[in-house]
Swiss-Prot record:
Required for hemolysin production. The gene is cvfC. This is Conserved virulence factor C. GO terms for molecular function: oxidoreductase activity. Signal peptide: none annotated. The keyword Lipid biosynthesis does not apply. InterPro entries: ARM-like, ARM-type_fold, Nfu/NifU_N, Nfu/NifU_N_sf, PBS_lyase_HEAT, Virulence_F_dom. SUPFAM superfamilies: ARM repeat, Hypothetical protein SAV1430. Keywords: Virulence. Belongs to the CvfC family.
Length: 374
């Protein structure tokens, strides 16, 4: 059994290892520690420092690494674990992987709906910041003698961000303070004490009209409107289109997120505006939305992103072309084959290989990997 190629996946902590052997049992397994009953090559891989789990299905492995582990160290060890290591993709030894590549997960720690701490997690770093003391004080006021604080704390997913983690923290802090202004804290405390149950998850949705939004001059209020906006419909497009021109990046980003919820090809022109935004975070978010929608009609616009100055945006473009592209995109892919970012270069090589081999897009495989049992 040999390794045919190594491919990146949407997660910076997971690599796909394509094998020359296909499982005949059509089953899948997840391995997390060395055990005698497991295949020898699986145990060899799990013995590599930094590898945390392996998912084996069909003819490939999804290899997960620890967030602080480096692919540039792990990949040669993966090759060496197979008998014919010299046939593995030799180029993986050459480029240097940037540990700061990819997504930064943003989370907000709350107690009974009252926020008091932000956590950011990147591929190799975790950063936390407590909100101003008044938030902690109000959180304390919401406690009762019978509350199990540890059990009742909740991490709210704020979505992914991109860029320098310290700068991202500044931006997320600004967003949180705008979404939960100090003036709202007494209301949250009152609600928490009135409800007084362990599953309290105070959040409300409120639809606003274009006129009301347009008449709002405070950007923090505009952001709050978007954060509390229900799932949008076609009738909300004028409002969201207006928000795309906002001077504040968090507002534009949230407008893109909401537009991406309208699952229709008619929304693509508005997402294209996001691809041209001056903020790389907004451009990447727009690319993520287009990727989630999966409309091949977006290929010409995504091809243009291969020239984006930010590698997080170029990577998303190459990934989309891999998922949806065809022979028409080969010239553009080959023109960018020497991208100086390891992840982008590998993704471009993978897209070229898939298209030239006539293989179908692997969207269903990514879905299977995402839904696998951990």
């Amino acid at each position: 059994m040999e390794i045919l190629r190594i491919e990146p996946t949407p997660s910076p902590n997971t690599m796909k290892v394509v094998l020359s052997y296909t499982r005949e049992d059509k089953l899948s397994n997840t391995y997390k520690k060395v055990e005698e009953t497991q295949p020898r090559f699986i145990n060899q891989l799990l013995s590599i420092d930094g590898i945390t789990s392996i998912f084996h299905v069909m003819n490939f492995l999804a290899v997960d690494k620890a967030p602080k582990a480096d692919w540039e160290v792990i990949l040669p060890d993966i090759k060496a674990a197979f008998s014919d290591a010299n046939k593995v993709l030799e180029s993986v030894n050459e480029p240097q992987i940037d540990n700061h590549f990819g997504e930064i997960k943003a989370e907000l720690l709350t107690f009974k709906g009252i926020p008091y701490q932000i956590k950011l997690t990147s591929a190799d770093q975790e950063l936390r910041e407590q909100l101003p003391q008044t938030y902690v004080d109000h959180m304390t006021q919401a406690q009762t003698a019978h509350d199990n604080i540890v059990f009742m704390r909740k991490w709210l997913d704020l979505g992914n961000r991109y860029g320098n983690i310290e700068e991202v923290m500044d931006g997320v802090l600004e967003e949180v303070l705008a979404t939960y202004p100090e003036s709202q804290l007494p209301v949250l405390v009152k609600h928490a004490l009135e409800e007084n149950h362990a599953t309290n998850n105070y959040h409300f949705y409120r639809h606003v009209s274009l006129d009301e939004y347009h008449a709002t001059y405070n950007w923090k209020t505009r952001l709050r409107m978007l954060n509390h906006f229900p799932k949008p419909t076609f009738e909300d497009i004028p409002l969201l289109d207006l928000a795309l021109s906002d001077e504040k990046v968090p507002v534009r980003r949230q407008a893109i997120v909401l537009l991406g919820m309208i699952e229709s090809k008619e929304i693509l022109p508005y997402l294209y505006k996001g691809l041209r935004d001056k903020s790389p975070a907004v451009r990447r978010t727009a690319g993520d939305c287009i990727s989630d929608l999966g409309y091949p009609e977006a290929l010409p616009e995504m091809v243009l992103l291969l020239d984006d100055p930010q590698k997080i945006v170029r990577w998303r473009a190459a990934m989309f072309i891999f998922d949806e592209g065809n022979a028409e995109q080969l010239p553009a892919l080959k023109a960018h084959i020497n991208d100086n970012a390891f992840e982008v270069k590998l993704q471009i090589e993978m897209a070229i290989s898939r298209i030239e081999n006539g293989d179908e897009a692997l969207g269903s495989v990514w879905k299977q990997m995402a839904n696998r049992t951990i």
